[in-house]
Amino acid sequence: DVTVKLGADSGALVFEPSSVTIKAGETVTWVNNAGFPHNIVFDEDEVPSGANAEALSHEDYLNAPGESYSAKFDTAGTYGYFCEPHQGAGMKGTITVQ
């Protein structure tokens, strides 16, 4: 299982780390690090066949530091995701499930 920060310690609008590798059946937990509103959105074109992008996404904002969201990944492959309000700033991430 892996934890990803929403926002760097420096305040940068990034997922930290932006790329993680896990085994099938493991969980990724995103934690709001900086107090900016962030969410986690998976694009249906950026997930493996058979994975449910909508079910993995957390479109409601995590506003306060320490707020978190977890998702379990059962299907092997590469998952691309982004933060909706900060996508233009390059706030994107990748999860590789083995």
From Swiss-Prot:
Record key words, sorted: Chloroplast, Copper, Electron transport, Membrane, Metal-binding, Plastid, Thylakoid, Transport
Residues annotated as transmembrane: none
The Plastocyanin-like domain, residue ranges: 1-98
Predominant localisation class: plastid
Classification via InterPro entries: BlueCu_1, BlueCu_1_BS, Copper_blue_Plastocyanin, Cupredoxin, Plastocyanin
Subcellular location: Plastid, Chloroplast thylakoid membrane
Cofactor(s) this protein requires: Cu(2+)
UniProt binding sites for Cu cation: 38, 83, 86, 91
Presence of the UniProt keyword Metal-binding in the record: yes
Bilayer topology annotation: Peripheral membrane protein
GO CC terms of this entry: chloroplast thylakoid lumen; chloroplast thylakoid membrane
GO molecular function, one term: copper ion binding
Record Pfam families: Copper-bind
Function as written in the Swiss-Prot or TrEMBL entry: Participates in electron transfer between P700 and the cytochrome b6-f complex in photosystem I.
Family membership noted in the UniProt record: Belongs to the plastocyanin family.
Record NCBIfam families: cyanin_plasto
Protein name: Plastocyanin
Lineage: Eukaryota, Viridiplantae, Chlorophyta, core chlorophytes, Chlorophyceae
Gene that specifies this protein: petE
